[in-house]
Amino acid sequence: MRIDIITIFPDYFGPVGPSGRVGASGPLGVSLIGKAGARGDIDFRVHDLRSWAADVHHTVDDTPFGGGPGMVMKADVWGDALDAVLADASAGTARLVVPAPSGTPFTQELAAGYARETHLVFACGRYEGIDSRVAADAQTRMTVDEVSIGDYVLAGGEAAVSVIVEAVCRLLPGVLGNEQSNRDDSFGGTGGAMSGLLEGPVYTRPRTWRERTVPDVLLSGNHRVIARWQRDEALRRTAVNRPDLIRRLAAAPDGLDKRDRQVLADAGFPVDTENMAH
């Protein structure tokens, strides 16, 4: 996969070398994703938006038409940047992702969809955002997504891009040491035992720590019983923290079996009524 990131703060993603290649530090150069980049499995390229600003001050923003506070990032600068980044890309293969509080919520399902792409381009906005004509123009050449990572506002798109890139790249083949890890993720929709649920509690050695012991069931060696316990715990946690996910499962064919519904009812979250108890 090729990932291009356009930003006015390229150093946010680590030291940038020739052709926008990222060095072995920063969020793109560390951990398993950094190793995937070093192997060439992921081609990261980071570009300084100011490189396409024509004036001596490398201006990338201007006052908004219609008035109002703040500044808006200029269409001409962004247009030239996207033209240059896409110049050596195969026609129709790139997908543009623009983080924005007003965008579509970013989900695990969307991350899985992005992981099937061959080329992602991220546009890191700042100030009041990017002139809306940039996305409209880009849509004539590629799919364009405005994506929100949550109901809050950041100073710029760089942090959001880091979140999205990590969520996507860990789903690529060979990035994680154990591919099974993806199947039982929170929000996993790949048919694992935790599909549609938040992941439950996890434990490791020592068995006893500060007088707190690991649940005996996890030491039993009975994988069927362990799997059931893990699902029960996931159901309880999801009901408390994300009841909307339980409602979604309850409405889906085969989303919850009889045991699931009993576990939830015992925990005070009956799902056979329109509104669950809390």
Map each language-model feature to its residues.
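Structured adenosyl-cofactor binding patch, chiefly the S-adenosyl-L-methionine
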Residues: 130, 134-189
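N-terminal nucleotide/polyanion-binding subdomain common to many enzyme families
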Residues: 1-85, 224-247
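A cross-family acyltransferase "interaction/gating" segment
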Residues: 177-208
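SAM-dependent methyltransferases
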Residues: 1, 196-197, 202-278
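Short His-Asn-centered micro-motif
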Residues: 9, 99-101, 123-125, 150, ...
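Hydrophobic/aromatic beta-strand patches that form the interior of the parallel beta-sheet core
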Residues: 4-6, 45-47, 97, 120-122, ...
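S-adenosyl-L-methionine/SAH cofactor-binding core of RNA-modifying enzymes
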Residues: 73-131, 173
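Intrinsically disordered, low-complexity terminal tails and inter-domain linkers enriched
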Residues: 16-25, 90-91, 273-277
